[in-house]
């Protein structure tokens, strides 16, 4: 699968590693699938992972420094 939007460069500017990005996106996607409120009004993606990546790119979802050990 190739990610074209949001760009990987924009996503990596929000987190410090690809590993942290993948864990953060997966956790947020699970929250979205479980019915958590969405952080944006409009999404390009229909899938939870795509929505999570869009939220990360927009700066709406970040890693909490106090719980950083949960991410890696």
Curated annotation (Swiss-Prot):
It holds the Pfam family RNA_pol_Rpb6. It is an enzyme of class 2 (transferase). GO terms for cellular component: DNA-directed RNA polymerase complex. It comes from the Bacteria. It catalyses: RNA(n) + a ribonucleoside 5'-triphosphate = RNA(n+1) + diphosphate. Keywords: DNA-directed RNA polymerase, Nucleotidyltransferase, Transcription, Transferase. Its EC number is 2.7.7.6. Coiled coil: none annotated. GO terms for molecular function: DNA binding; DNA-directed RNA polymerase activity. Transmembrane segments: none annotated. GO terms for biological process: DNA-templated transcription. Promotes RNA polymerase assembly. Latches the N- and C-terminal regions of the beta' subunit thereby facilitating its interaction with the beta and alpha subunits. Belongs to the RNA polymerase subunit omega family. PANTHER family: DNA-DIRECTED RNA POLYMERASE SUBUNIT OMEGA (PTHR34476:SF1). The RNAP catalytic core consists of 2 alpha, 1 beta, 1 beta' and 1 omega subunit. When a sigma factor is associated with the core the holoenzyme is formed, which can initiate transcription. This is DNA-directed RNA polymerase subunit omega. The lineage of its organism: Bacteria, Bacillati, Bacillota, Bacilli, Lactobacillales.
